[in-house]
């Protein structure tokens, strides 16, 4: 029998194991909060467009940490809040995730899910008492917790796609995240109507009602 050529024999032999390569960092598409600084202005992007940028607990905590850093950084003079994608700034808290967590913890009598609201309210207070100017781009859906974030801004930009609401009453909750303060800017009849019914307002409505 003829000997197998060296080139063929080498191809048939199992390849030597390759050293493990480090995994690449998560692409920005997988990050729930994006952060960059342009011309001394910090730009924070809520990055869950498939969920209308609804706030997860991890997002709330990350936002709080970023804001503390921005507040302490003298090189940053202003802050911009925006949402990723064309459909919304922020639809509020991730109610589905909270509901699922509450159901799971109810079996053990735990109520750790309530920590989300504690952290969210602290985040809103941090924004509403922020020492640097804030601009909020309220393009698209801006509801519930999204209003809590956006209403902290000295300059709030609404568009023809803006849809504003405090829909908490539809799931048995009260309008929160500072709503008793910012809804009071409207005439009392409108304040009660929006707060009790969860009615949706357009960008033009928001301008007319000083939201």
Predicted segments, located by residue:
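Short, flexible helix-coil linker/hinge segments at the edges of structured domains or between repeats
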Residues: 110-112, 157-187
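Conserved CoA-thioester-binding segment of acyl-CoA-metabolizing enzymes
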Residues: 1-17, 21-82, 125
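Mechanochemical coupling/switch segment within NTP-driven translocation systems
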Residues: 114-122
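Contiguous, well-ordered alpha-helical segments that form the cores/surfaces of helical PPI scaffolds
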Residues: 121, 144-152, 181, 185
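Glycine-rich beta-to-alpha active-site loop
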Residues: 127-171, 198, 203
